[in-house]
């Protein structure tokens, strides 16, 4: 191909001339060091190139060579447990080749070309296959079975297929369609800006269980849903994302650290190999793909990292897996868009962000969903996307948050006031919402308990009433309230402190199964019902609040999953204590 020349350099933006043979979104190599870039605008023979590496040292006149291919990712065995940068370069391989610091222009394959994987066919010679059909499996980790699929655009009859140890570029099967024979390897390439095709979208009705009480009970997200976690600095966005990556009942987790601090990725690398998946008992790292594009890496690569991550997520979704993708933080991605837009001298929108911010965000989030994959087998897969948003100063009216809220169905609004009061997760139950509640409620009532939805509604109305009563208390004092209203305040406080608060760093409290959540919630509301019964029988509120059983209700969150029946004993004890109190007419142990 014809070589272009650098005309102008403006930070991560390079303008080259003599590029009439190139296409928009082609990957190019810039300068003598062959820096990786992507064409984002074409005007006659001039190409505006977004360079994914530091451009210091480039000069006008340097060569620009187009590869003729769009920015693509390699999909195949070797993705799980790997850590990539924003353009899918494996960081471990770069370290082995160039040292601790990523040198510019370093070229390494995304997937290891030397490592051999044991391929077990599930189809035989003579079988007819089409795009999306599984022809064999590779046991990638102890918990992930990597399904080798027929690439998009290929169909026909299998001519040869064999079991054995192969690298990702070795031919494992041959498919013949009329006179054309296609060699199938274990690796596929896919352009990151194009969503992977599927049969059809399905209605998401099954919740993604996260083990976080405030999320699962009040603001659930479905498998195949979209959610956002906006919040000011220090409100716990990253810890929420880490908790979801650790405990969500997805089979594959893709974690994108997009423009956040490097220490946060270090935490993931330190914790995930040690933490055990509650379902399989294996380390969490054995189902995780990490994309580290930290704040000290080039800004332009942040835009690519989001697309790289979601393409990998779609690939595992096509295998029929439930995938959870965490993007922390989409605000940094939007800032990268803003910087490139400014360099291109485009007309700015709100706060300098480009006018197309909303459509780019929609392109990303709309790639989530529950789908019926391509192929004759009809596998169901789901890709759930959860994006953190970091609005400056916690201002939720800023453009990135507003663009995100127009697209996603679940809003977990983090509140700095709750965080300052050490209430974590600091999800504000009055501001947050989930539009999946109606879809999920029948599943919860069927699979957890028939009165789940009713309990949730009661608890939510109590918290809402507490907010209204607190306004009265601020104006005229708590003594102006009736005993019934004061009881409501106490029960709402119990809901907040004993149920909604959850310690991410406590070995038991970090995760609560749906059964435990149901019993804990029912216990708090049972306390409300029993104390109301006692109040109606003439017992003083102070006596009810001084009961020792209240401490046991507060400590129920620390009961392990194996000893969950101990919560049932608290129900019986509470009922007995109230009965005794009523029969004596109050004042126990007098």
UniProtKB/Swiss-Prot annotation:
It comes from the Bacteria. Keywords: ATP synthesis, ATP-binding, Hydrogen ion transport, Ion transport, Nucleotide-binding, Translocase, Transport. It is an enzyme of class 7 (translocase). The keyword Transport applies. One of its GO terms (biological process) is proton motive force-driven plasma membrane ATP synthesis. One of its GO terms (cellular component) is proton-transporting ATP synthase complex. The keyword Cytoplasm does not apply. ATP binds at residues 231-238. Its EC number is 7.1.2.2. It catalyses: ATP + H2O + 4 H(+)(in) = ADP + phosphate + 5 H(+)(out). SUPFAM superfamilies: C-terminal domain of alpha and beta subunits of F1 ATP synthase, N-terminal domain of alpha and beta subunits of F1 ATP synthase, P-loop containing nucleoside triphosphate hydrolases. One of its GO terms (molecular function) is proton-transporting ATP synthase activity, rotational mechanism. Coiled coil: none annotated. Belongs to the ATPase alpha/beta chains family. Produces ATP from ADP in the presence of a proton gradient across the membrane. The V-type alpha chain is a catalytic subunit. This is V-type ATP synthase alpha chain. It comes from Clostridium botulinum (strain Langeland / NCTC 10281 / Type F). The gene is atpA.
């Amino acid at each position: 191909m014809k070589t272009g020349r650098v005309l102008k350099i403006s930070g991560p933006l390079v303008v080259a001339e003599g590029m009439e043979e190139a296409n928009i979104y082609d990957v190019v190599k810039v300068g003598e060091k062959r820096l990786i870039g992507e064409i984002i605008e074409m005007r006659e023979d001039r190409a505006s190139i977004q360079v994914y590496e530091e451009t210091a040292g480039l000069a006008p006149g340097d060569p620009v060579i187009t590869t003729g291919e769009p920015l693509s990712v390699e999909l195949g065995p070797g993705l799980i447990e790997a850590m990539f940068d924003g353009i899918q370069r494996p960081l471990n391989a770069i370290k082995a080749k160039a040292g601790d610091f990523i040198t510019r222009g370093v070229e390494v394959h995304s997937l290891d070309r030397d490592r051999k994987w044991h391929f077990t066919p599930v189809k035989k010679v003579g079988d007819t296959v089409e795009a999306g059909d599984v022809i064999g499996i590779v046991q990638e980790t102890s918990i992930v079975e990597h399904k080798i699929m027929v690439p998009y655009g290929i169909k026909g009859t299998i001519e040869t297929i064999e079991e054995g140890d192969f690298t990702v570029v070795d031919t494992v099967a041959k498919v013949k369609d009329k006179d054309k024979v296609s060699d199938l390897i274990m690796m596929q390439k896919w352009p990151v800006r194009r969503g992977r095709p599927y049969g059809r979208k399905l209605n998401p009705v099954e919740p993604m269980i996260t083990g976080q009480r405030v999320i699962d009970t009040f603001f659930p997200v479905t498998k195949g849903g979209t959610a956002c976690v906006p919040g000011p600095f220090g409100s716990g966005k990253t810890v929420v994302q880490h908790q979801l990556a650790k405990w969500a009942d997805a089979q594959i987790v893709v974690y994108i650290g997009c423009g956040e601090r490097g220490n946060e990725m270090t935490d993931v690398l330190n914790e995930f190999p040690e933490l055990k998946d509650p379902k399989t008992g294996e380390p969490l790292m054995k189902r995780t793909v990490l994309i580290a594009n930290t704040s000290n890496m080039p800004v332009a690569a942040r835009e690519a990292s989001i697309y790289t991550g979601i393409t990998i997520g779609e690939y595992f979704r096509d295998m029929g897996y439930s995938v959870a993708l965490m993007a922390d933080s989409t605000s940094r991605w939007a800032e990268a868009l803003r910087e490139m837009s400014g360099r291109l001298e485009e007309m700015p929108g709100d706060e300098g962000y480009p006018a197309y911010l909303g459509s780019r965000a929609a392109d990303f989030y709309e790639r989530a969903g529950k789908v019926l994959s391509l192929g004759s087998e009809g596998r169901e897969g789901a890709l759930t996307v959860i994006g953190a948003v970091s609005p400056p100063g916690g201002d939720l009216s800023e453009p990135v948050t507003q663009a995100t809220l127009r697209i996603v169905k679940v809003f977990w609004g983090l509140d700095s006031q709750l965080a300052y009061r050490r209430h974590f997760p600091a999800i504000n139950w009055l501001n947050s919402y989930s539009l999946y509640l109606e879809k999920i409620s029948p599943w919860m009532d069927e699979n957890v308990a028939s009165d789940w939805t009713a309990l949730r509604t009661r608890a939510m109305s109590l918290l809402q009433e507490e907010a209204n009563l607190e306004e009265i208390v601020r104006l005229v004092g708590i003594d102006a309230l009736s005993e019934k209203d004061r009881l409501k305040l106490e029960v709402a406080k119990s809901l907040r402190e004993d149920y909604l608060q959850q310690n991410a760093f406590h070995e038991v409290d970090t995760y609560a199964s749906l059964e435990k959540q149901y019993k804990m919630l029912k216990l708090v509301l049972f306390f409300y019902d029993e104390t109301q019964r006692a109040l109606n029988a003439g017992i003083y509120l102070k006596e009810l609040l001084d009961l020792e059983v209240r401490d046991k209700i507060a400590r129920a969150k620390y009961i392990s999953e194996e000893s969950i029946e101990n919560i049932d004993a608290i129900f019986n004890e509470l009922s007995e204590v109230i009965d005794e109190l009523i029969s004596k007419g109050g004042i126990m142990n007098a």
